[in-house]
Regions:
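Sec-dependent N-terminal signal peptides
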Residues: 4-13
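Alpha/propeptide regions of enzymes that mature by internal proteolysis
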Residues: 17-386
Length: 386
């Protein structure tokens, strides 16, 4: 009966053009997810994407093929209301702008944007222009905030030196930002990304935790583009070794441009409605690598593993003139939030892989989606699903 159920679920997703997620395949995870099992389960958080896909065949710089985009995350919708935040880098072969001020001030004052490595500058500049045009600061007499823009490298599939992300794509991602279910896989900034030897991209997940009889949400969004297939682990099963010779990456570019095994990056954004101060949010992001390690991440030399966490609690914490009173959980009670963070990161990465579809790009380079049918058989072999 369970076999029939899984089959029906997969068929229904295909016919409805809705991408399945890890739990839809029966993959087990620890912890209880929120309504959407996404970062948007944290009230006020909005996510939007702009996706750019065009061309096929040989790479002509400036012409394509293009496989890239932009993703936008707003902590409290499209209004200026800074949140407590902090960040951490497991391995710093990457970039996230604006984090120096996040560390210094303890606040995230801007939306978070994620794109490809070569488009950080244009995205940052476009966000600054949007501040002015949108009147982001409202009645605040404010002179400047530092846009937070993260990146991962999509040059295996994308004409990354063609600089195809433009201001209009940044504005489109911002305008598309909304609450509710989060689109995953080959979307937005994750369009051209790879994960653990298969196609990757954007993924999201959430957890509900109870502390002193009060429920809190931890939500995660990843732009996943890291790892070596041999390390891929799902539900504790060495899936990568089982699929080591299946649907390998097709690489037709010049040898000098070949991607090294294990290189890549991952951007992780953690949101919570639990009342946490910046130093506690630093502790939250320190737990992100646990989830990455659970699926096979190793923080390689060529990887940019950069994480940021924010709390939407304490809505009036930011004030330029007055003393404010804020709430915070005691350190002795926040271990469940650590566990929830690791769990949601792990599931978000797998969701990115499950939602991703096979994609070809420059020179016919191809990244295959992880085969759902084979994955289910492997997990059954190891008694992880019935």
């Amino acid at each position: 009966m369970k076999k029939l159920t899984i089959f029906i679920i997969i068929i229904s997703f295909l016919t409805a053009n809705i991408k399945p997620r890890a739990r839809d395949l029966g993959i087990p995870f620890f912890g209880k997810p929120g309504r959407y099992n996404a970062i948007t389960d944290v009230k006020g958080v909005e996510v939007g994407h702009s996706t750019i896909i065009s061309g096929k065949g040989k790479n002509i710089v400036g012409m394509g093929p293009v496989r890239t985009g932009v993703t936008a995350i707003f902590p409290r919708g499209k209004k200026f209301n800074p949140v407590y935040a902090n960040w951490y880098s497991l391995n710093g072969n990457g970039e996230m702008t604006g984090t120096t001020w996040v560390t210094e001030s303890g606040f995230l004052e801007t939306p978070i944007m994620i794109t490809n490595t070569n488009s950080v500058g244009v995205v940052r500049d476009a966000v600054l222009k949007w501040y002015v045009d949108y009147n982001w600061y409202g009645n605040e007499e404010w002179w400047y905030t530092y846009p937070v823009v993260g990146e991962t490298y999509d040059g295996f599939l994308n004409d990354i030196y063609g600089f195809h992300v433009k201001e209009k794509h940044v504005l489109e991602a911002i305008e598309n930002a909304r609450s509710g279910p989060v689109k995953e896989g080959n979307i937005g900034g994750g369009t051209g990304m790879l994960t653990l030897g298969f196609k990757g991209g954007i993924g999201s997940a959430s957890r509900v935790v109870k502390i002193n009889d009060k429920k809190y949400i931890v939500g995660v969004l990843v732009q996943s583009n890291f790892g070596s297939r041999k390390n891929l682990t799902i539900s504790g099963v060495p899936v990568g070794l089982e699929l080591e010779d299946t649907l390998k990456l097709v690489y037709n570019a010049p040898p000098s441009n070949k991607k090294k095994d294990g290189d890549g990056s991952i951007i992780v954004i953690v949101a919570t409605d639990a009342p946490l101060l910046p130093h506690q949010l630093k502790r939250i992001v320190h737990r992100v690598p646990i989830g990455i390690g659970n699926v096979g991440g190793r923080g390689s030399n060529g990887s940019g593993d950069i994480f940021l966490a924010f709390s939407t609690a304490n809505k009036n914490a930011f004030n330029r003139q007055k003393t404010t009173t804020v709430r915070t959980l005691p350190n002795d009670l926040i271990t469940p939030l650590f566990e929830a963070t690791a769990q949601a990161v792990e599931e978000a990465i797998i969701n990115a892989m499950i939602a991703a579809e096979t994609m070809d790009g420059i020179h016919g380079n191809t990244a295959y989606a992880i085969p759902h049918d084979r994955l289910i058989k492997i997990l059954k072999k190891y008694n992880r699903i019935d």
